[in-house]
Amino acid sequence: MRRAFKFEELLAWVSSKTHPDAETIKKLQKQVEELSMAEQTEENRTEFLAASKKLDDILLKQEIYWAQRSQIAWLKHGDKNTKFFHSKASQRQRRNMIHGVRDQQNIWVDEVEDIANVATNYFENLFSLGSCDRMEECLEAMQHKVTPDMKEIPSRDYSAEEIKAVLFQMGPTKAPGPYSMNALFYQKFWHIVGDDVIAVVLDFLNSGNMNFELNYTNIVLIPKNKSPERMSDYRPISLCNIIYKIIFKVMANRLKQILPNLISPTQSAFVPSRLITDNVLVAYETLHSMHCKKKGKKGALGLKLDINKAYDRVKWAFLEKIMYNLGFPEAWIERVMSCVSTLSFSIRINGKAYGNIIPTTGLRQGDPLLLYLFLLCAKRFTTLLTRAKEEGRLHGVSLCRRAPRITHLLFDDDSLLFCQANQEEVQCITDTLQLYAASSGQCINFEKSSVYFSSNMEVAHREGTIAALGVKDVESFESYLGLPTLIGWAKYQTFSFLKDQVWKKI
């Protein structure tokens, strides 16, 4: 009878296996050198070939180890260069080291334990439950979009073939989760561990039985800028274990099939057949039209929103209510909420895990399913804006007389809104933002948000709008989805960001 597969034993086995020892390599190199200089006998020749093969095998393992550590894919087919991989891994490690941060009292701390305490307190507060205000008001009159045919897709039973296909779609050497194993192990030894993996995954997907240990996650902190000083300057990225990634990916593949029928065309992120360039082109043409509008009494404005920690602030009750209102099957909703709400995680600081945080709100960044769930939440924001447009409270911007009026463009959490520059429409935008923020948990950072006015708007008329919105006025948005929004005569200045990005890679 085959012995049951144990994750604890597997973890212990992985921990005992380290990268090739430098001392062993030196001994083999010395042995090969001595044999090459020795008398040319058949016995010496056999020993020389055996030692050379052993040395080559160890050097190959060392190269693979450092290639995985360095996370470099663009030299995959190049010459062997272990020293390069080693230097890249060391460079990444130095860049990702946290040498100090400022705590809530603005005091600089540089001891690892103190940094860990600051990080733990910050994320415990960030992922704690806030009040769920005005949810019913926000979700009222929300029509079911999930048809009976669409319901059949997430409701049908899952299969072993589906699970295996998802595993082999994963990048084999992507960053491992808390159990220190990436997808390559499961792909390589599928004939050994496959049945056990399938049993665990199907037990949850088909019956809802969740092993909470599977949902333990490491959070790594990626700096947003060159000189991060506060925890808000770091982006938390989840490193889940492979079993849980399989569960999420299988469910995401089902949801992806019906997503285009649920998400508004103004949202281009992660939806099949939609491109980021669609939003870029529409935004560029709309802003260019506003820039060229020199005459007329009616002005227009574009509002670029900065949403603070968009994924981390999503309220679970809001997400659950959204799915019920859209008409998803109850069993599917229970599986999703089980994935979302059974999470626990530790923060990795300089290679070591600290704390055991159990959140009560927020969605993890890095999970494919949660990307789609965030779009379902953002759908309500789109619906509120569309309803305001249909009721005549919001008119947006039109490029020409018969062109459709554009009120908003969304890409993930990147939002660009358009309206007429008058008191009524500005108030409508403000009310909509307040309603959506209160019910969903989203926090609009008005200090980092900005507004751009059409050229026919006089400066004196802009002041009231700026005061009502509480944002800064700009001559042009610096960029939208990584590309310039307006291109004038100063081409060098406009495209200087391309040069900067190239230099960062060199």
Language model segments and positions:
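Basic, alpha-helical interaction scaffolds
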Residues: 1-14, 20, 463-506
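Active-site-proximal segment of RNA-dependent polymerases
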Residues: 134-155, 162, 209-218, 225-226, ...
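Arg/Lys-enriched, amphipathic patches
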Residues: 1-110, 120, 124-125, 153-156, ...
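Surface-exposed loop/turn segments and immediately adjacent short secondary-structure elements
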Residues: 70-72, 76-232, 238, 246, ...
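Conserved catalytic palm subdomain of right-hand nucleotidyl-transferase polymerases, strongest
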Residues: 100, 174-181, 230-239, 280-324
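Conserved pre-motif C helix in the palm subdomain of viral-like polymerases
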Residues: 232-263, 281-287, 308, 331, ...
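Catalytic palm subdomain of template-directed nucleic-acid polymerases
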Residues: 309-326, 362-363, 414-438, 453-462, ...
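Short, conserved micro-motifs composed of acidic
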Residues: 399, 447-474
